[in-house]
Regions:
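Feature for intrinsically disordered/low-complexity regulatory segments and propeptides
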Residues: 1-130
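Intrinsic disorder/low-complexity polar-acidic segments
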Residues: 121-174
Length: 174
């Protein structure tokens, strides 16, 4: 069994994330990237509220920013590692020269995704809310492992009533 969280801990974390996450729809001309000492941050400029939101950029959002702007991943990564100011200059230039509306998904002060405005939001909380009641109705089902990471939610459930012998002496439960 893989170690992770208990089902209760997973539920607590998903509820916490649901409460603190925020999604922004912004014109890229209102997004500015800056290279800091050891990380990158983006500033979301919000003229209506006269307040800017400053966020660290995670690896997933970096990859999506590069893809959105048509910057090859290898070159993006090279600039990110070797010349951060050049990367910021390139990204900011392309944000202004090829404007589009993008969704910036955030969690805990981090830009965790940079997506199309048409992206359909399905959060881990919603998935758990739909799946867990069904699992609870399965007699003898047990959660073997569960975890939520920056990229995915994992939930492994074993139903001992569903089993088969894949080879002599090797029984697998589903």
């Amino acid at each position: 069994m893989k170690h992770g969280r208990t089902l209760t801990e997973l539920a607590i974390e998903l509820d916490r994330q649901r409460k603190v996450k925020k999604d922004y729809l912004l014109d890229t001309r209102n997004v500015k990237m800056d290279a800091m000492e050891n990380f990158f941050q983006i500033t979301l400029i919000n003229d209506e509220q006269r307040a800017n939101t400053i966020l660290r950029v995670n690896d997933i959002a970096h990859r999506q920013i590069g893809s959105t702007l048509g910057i090859p991943a290898k070159y993006y990564d090279k600039m990110r590692a070797e010349n951060p100011d050049l990367l910021s200059t390139n990204v900011n230039s392309w944000f202004n020269e090829t404007p589009s509306v993008r969704m910036v998904r955030t969690l805990d002060g981090t830009a965790r995704a940079f997506l199309s405005e048409r992206y359909r939001r399905i959060d881990n909380y919603e998935i758990a809310e739909a799946v867990l009641p069904i699992i609870a109705q399965i007699p003898d089902a047990r959660v073997a492992s569960c975890e939520v990471t920056e990229q995915r939610m994992y939930l492994k459930v074993v139903n001992p009533r569903l089993e088969t012998e894949v080879s002599p002496g090797d029984v697998v439960q589903s």
